């Protein structure tokens, strides 16, 4: 069965068109795909660990014994030494599974990302291989522009949007959760549109680890930055504090009357008491870091404007792929394979590429 991440599949499938170097090699655990943006020569190393991704430019090599010692701590979800976390921030993340950093970016800095989104969504800029997604309630509109596009993925293919993922301010905070050797494994610019009445702009409660076939989960973190003001009215993030300490739950498409956007899986039969949920209202430039097992989602955008945010998931280079056959992740694996076939990648499992 496939051990595959959506962004990685898309990057692999579009490599030749996007000037991305793809090298497939067998390693002792599984066949894995390694890619790097040839134009920028981002380093891809550590083949012995069987990892996929784009590393933090400033590497801090460690011997295996040193790395093991680094992970031994009274804390489970954060790492010792060289981080920006205060004692109270560290304990908050340990207890709750998320941490909001206020004012990490100046609002004016983020306008470049918003402008670039509009250039791509309106067709003024073409980025080969970039995934452009449209809201299910708007995709048949006559003018597929910024009012229809609700998400861009695979930001590493665009020089301007990629700057967010390699910004030292983000990487320094991410180091507190994944360590100094980092990979960008999933990238998005989200443009939540005003809801048309069918509530399709919602994102069901889910856990990001559902989409990630690699472990350990504790060495993965999401950085999510508000480009515009994010409040309950326009569908801010909602999270269940402490849920990151639980297991990965079974996901499926919710049975919503007016449909659900592609790959918007939600936790199956989730009945968490609403009083435990918190709404993460944020100003432009505020950034939340959260664990991949944290249960979270977002409400419908009931405002008349859009709600933009940009995000990147980081994983430690020591992470390794798992086989998802027979697990709750098999459903998303099959969906990813179908997407790969539509994009011209004729393999059903990375293990086939090893022979």
Give each language-model segment a name.
Residues 45, 68-95, 102-205, 212-214, ...:
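Non-heme Fe(II)-dependent double-stranded beta-helix
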Residues 91, 230-295:
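Double-stranded beta-helix
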Residues 179, 208-220, 275-276, 282, ...:
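A short beta-loop-beta micro-motif enriched in histidine and acidic residues
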Residues 1-96, 111, 354-355:
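Fe(II)/2-oxoglutarate
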Residues 68-79, 127-130, 135, 143, ...:
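Non-heme Fe(II)/2-oxoglutarate
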Residues 213-232, 281-284, 289, 313-317:
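Short, conserved beta-strand element in jelly-roll/cupin
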Residues 188-191, 207-209, 225-229, 241:
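Short, structured patches in soluble enzyme cores that scaffold and shape functional sites
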Residues 159, 173, 209-213, 226-228, ...:
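Short helix-to-loop capping/linker segments positioned immediately adjacent to catalytic or ligand/cofactor-binding
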């Amino acid at each position: 069965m496939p051990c595959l991440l959506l962004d990685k599949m898309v990057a692999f499938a579009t490599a030749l068109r996007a000037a991305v170097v793809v090298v497939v090699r067998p390693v002792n655990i599984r066949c894995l795909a390694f890619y790097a943006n040839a134009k920028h020569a981002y380093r891809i190393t550590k083949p012995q660990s069987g990892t996929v991704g784009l590393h933090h430019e400033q590497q801090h090599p460690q011997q295996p014994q040193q790395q093991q010692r680094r992970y031994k701590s009274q804390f489970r979800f954060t790492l010792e030494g060289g981080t920006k976390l205060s004692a109270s921030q560290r304990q908050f993340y340990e207890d709750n599974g998320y941490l909001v950093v206020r004012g990490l970016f100046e609002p004016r800095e983020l306008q470049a990302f918003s402008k670039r989104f509009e250039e791509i969504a309106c067709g003024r800029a073409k980025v080969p291989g970039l995934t452009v997604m449209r809201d299910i309630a708007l995709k048949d509109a006559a003018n597929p522009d910024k009012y229809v596009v609700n998400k861009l993925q695979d930001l590493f293919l665009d020089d301007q949007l990629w700057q967010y993922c390699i910004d030292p301010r983000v990487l320094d905070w991410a180091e507190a959760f994944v360590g100094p050797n980092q990979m960008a494994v999933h990238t998005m610019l989200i443009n939540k549109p005003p809801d048309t009445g069918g509530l399709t702009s919602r994102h069901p409660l889910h856990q990001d680890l559902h989409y990630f076939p690699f472990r350990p989960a504790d060495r993965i973190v999401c950085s999510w930055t508000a480009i515009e003001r994010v409040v309950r009215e326009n569908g801010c993030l909602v999270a269940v504090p402490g849920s990151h300490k639980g297991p990965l739950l079974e996901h499926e498409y919710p049975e919503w009357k007016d449909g659900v956007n592609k790959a918007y899986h939600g936790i199956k039969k989730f009945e968490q008491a609403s009083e435990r949920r918190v709404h993460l209202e944020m100003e432009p430039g505020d950034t939340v870091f959260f664990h991949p097992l944290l249960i979270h989602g977002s409400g419908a955008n009931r405002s008349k404007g859009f709600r933009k945010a940009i995000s990147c998931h980081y994983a430690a280079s020591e992470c390794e792929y798992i086989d998802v056959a027979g697990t709750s992740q098999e459903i998303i694996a099959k969906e990813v394979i179908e997407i790969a076939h539509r994009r011209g990648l004729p393999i059903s499992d990375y293990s086939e590429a090893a022979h």
